[in-house]
Amino acid sequence: MITAADFYHVMTAMVPLYVAMILAYGSVKWWRIFTPDQCSGINRFVALFAVPLLSFHFISTNNPYTMNLRFIAADTLQKLMVLAMLTAWSHLSRRGSLEWTITLFSLSTLPNTLVMGIPLLKGMYGEFSGSLMVQIVVLQCIIWYTLMLFMFEYRGARMLITEQFPDTAANIASIVVDPDVVSLDGRRDAIETETEVKEDGRIHVTVRRSNASRSDIYSRRSMGFSSTTPRPSNLTNAEIYSLQSSRNPTPRGSSFNHTDFYSMVGRSSNFGAADAFGVRTGATPRPSNYEDDASKPKYPLPASNAAPMAGHYPAPNPAVSSAPKGAKKAATNGQAKGEDLHMFVWSSSASPVSDVFGGGAPDYNDAAAVKSPRKMDGAKDREDYVERDDFSFGNRGVMDRDAEAGDEKAAAAAGADPSKAMAAPTAMPPTSVMTRLILIMVWRKLIRNPNTYSSLIGLIWSLVCFRWNFEMPAIVLKSISILSDAGLGMAMFSLGLFMALQPHIIACGNKVATYAMAVRFLAGPAVMAAASFAVGLRGTLLHVAIVQAALPQGIVPFVFAKEYSVHPSILSTAVIFGMLIALPITLVYYILLGL
């Protein structure tokens, strides 16, 4: 039976965390103490130092030789059961997909164990439950987050192969990825593919970042590599940040001019910018053979309302899309007056600026759209249809039928048999090629993540020191403690800043939020209870396992979802709204299990 003293211990452990979160929220939302840039700096400190050192502190001080293997088996079995059910659903059901498998797996099995679980369970069940939570943290950081990265990169690789090599994927013998490419997801970084056919007829692919996404192109003019006369540019730092990091899959306005654009690409050319756009200046007009080619789309449009497709510049200049006639005329007139070209740039990854000030629908009445040739941009035909209030899993089937109808029209226009075109599935490269590609990308992600090092080093140190009774030097111990002690409060403070920067607490609509909360707080604990019974957990261990499964959503899965653009609004709502309702829900579980 739960006593008043037990309830007070729980509140003593949890209220300070919520105080830190509310202070951060008020500092941005009510008192305007921190700007978004300052919040970004605080969040970066938390991500690079506070949380990794907090994780290292908990793991290094936990004795791995006293781990409860049955409790770990229950947690592992729960995740494997959920993963097996979701995998079967994605393959057998028309409504299933890899994206939903990843999202539902995150919602149901990956709670916020480090920040919320350890203090909450210690307050409920004592010190031994804190040790159990540390064991869960170790498995999450080393195994389950790595598995999620594997699934995300597999999705990115599949999208890359499907879009770039729809008919020749089976003939790919190797895929080499440049060192500066850290993700295969075209929404995050604009990437290009180059192919080479060897004598045996096999295709060898090289994946690299496109010229438009390379960070060094923005500094070429200051380094003296510009091919044009230096002149003041109105491309601001904010726009550079927004070009590289906005997640909105819609064209966004940018105010830099065409001369800046060519200087960034760094290509010397024997024709002027006016020739490229067919602008005739001077007393004697002369014809331009570029305008005719640029005005023709390279591929036929599948539907009347489809976005314009890209033509080609002489390589390596980016391609210019054929905009509607009004847009083309406006751009030409503006250029004749010496005005700057107003460009639209497809943006592809996550940005707090774009989250708060999200752009609207594309408007081609004022400018031409500019894209890089062969750039991976999955956003153009993979709009996040799940982030709406009227969402249902059935929408996927409707959208699939719409897409098939568009493909059928395109195939009919090209004189092909649409039924045959849709019947043949896209082949994939050999398993060895895909496995090597994904492992390389996951490895690059892991070595850039400070939590990977903190977890592994903490585990190795605990194995050594508890085996031979070593003690960490006092200088090192206190250096780590002074930061790790602040880690818990700073993590909650950072979460409060994140909540304050969002335009809506429920970003995905009420219906989707209800589904997400049901998966997080009902389905997850239910599967954990079944797995715990299966491995023989009883008594207090069973209670700890169920309450641990009912913790709010983990932050790392949301970071991955935002980075790879896989239902980020759902995970954002699960983190924010879940944190607000987690305390009463876990208290209900605690009281019911204690009856």
Swiss-Prot record:
Cytoplasmic topological domain: 28-38, 92-100, 153-455, 501-516, 562-574
Record localization: Membrane
Family: Belongs to the auxin efflux carrier (TC 2.A.69.1) family.
NCBIfam families in the record: 2a69
GO molecular function: auxin efflux transmembrane transporter activity; identical protein binding; protein homodimerization activity
Chain's role: Acts as a component of the auxin efflux carrier. Seems to be involved in the polar auxin transport which may promote adventitious root emergence and control tillering.
Domain of life: Eukaryota
Binding residues annotated for (indol-3-yl)acetate, in chain numbering: V51, N112, L114, Y145, I555, V556
Disordered: annotated span: 281-335, 404-427
Keyword terms, alphabetized: Auxin signaling pathway, Membrane, Transmembrane, Transmembrane helix, Transport
Name of the protein described by the UniProt record: Auxin efflux carrier component 1a
Source organism per UniProt: Oryza sativa subsp. japonica (Rice)
Note: Plants silencing PIN1A exhibit inhibition of the emergence and development of adventitious roots, increased number of tillers and enlarged tiller angles.
Gene Ontology CC terms, in alphabetical order: auxin efflux carrier complex; cell periphery; endoplasmic reticulum; plasma membrane
Its membrane topology: Multi-pass membrane protein
Keyword Transport applies: yes
Tissue and organ distribution: Expressed in vascular tissues of root, stem and leaf. Expressed in anthers, embryo and in the primordia of adventitious and lateral roots. Expressed in roots, stem bases, stems, leaves and young panicles.
InterPro entries: Auxin_eff_plant, Auxin_Efflux_Carrier, Mem_transp_PIN-like
Residues on Extracellular side: 1-6, 60-70, 122-131, 477-479, 538-540
Subunit structure: Homodimer.
Biased composition (Low complexity): 411-427
